[in-house]
């Protein structure tokens, strides 16, 4: 819920909050923040807090360097891992120009616009993520190593699964912040873990994904470990994915999911650079249940889009290519627009590819388009896309393609 200025100030006083983090993300999805004292709350909630945009790649230059953080009071949350005395709270922020207009390269604002555009068509989206990460040991100097915390396998239990207590601490911390995980387990790789989230409306789901990464990093440090979200931390081992579960419903009761899936399949090559943002992302494709071919099917985990065996409100499409280094605000916004394009254009869903791509012959696989094989190919696909040129500010497109 949105809190009034007086309610925020009262809460801060009652909870002995001494610092308020005003959080936002850069274009890559990395969280940034400015911390203010309670005395500055009134100014922050009325006028915003200025920051130097020229220091954030893609946000501006020295000539046009002033932007303002505008707190979203609905996102107020305590940070449970901070001290009980002199506590710390956080609010996510929108970004505005000095005249009060929204900053066009604010990915959170781009997602809000996508949600509003979908609502005008009578379509509501929801997203749930499946987040994978590795836990590595630290050396005697406290620096991260590539030594896995354990050597357990998929869904193993203690004592082989040493990450169980860490995952529990992560989930309980998230619950204290109002973020509700659905389940957690050990993944296939040594020291690899997964925590899944139920559906939320798009903005909340993206906020939760950013919060999750912060909590995992903080809990790992508290346990003398290092969390690694990179798409391919260890050669010869499974990579980290961020599977995105997508649900779309139409106000008129029509089943729009086939068109949404068709739209995403039609645009996935040009979207890939926003879902898989680093060179190592492309080392993950095609191995350990990570897709390479542009296809869909029911239940089949070798596909790009899988339709899980779920009914009713749990019916969804699972996009399996993204990884945890993506900007969730931008990723969700572009998936909404791809789905809406499928609905508007009446794009037909191609036949399901009921084959196992991990064991299929080259002759069979040659019938399907592939995701970009390298970051350079993904950048080229995005740069030449009329679809993206219509949707994204040039600064955002340049950041990802230059």
Give the positions of each predicted feature.
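Glycine-rich, acidic/polar active-site loops that bind/position phosphate-bearing ligands
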Residues: 1-402
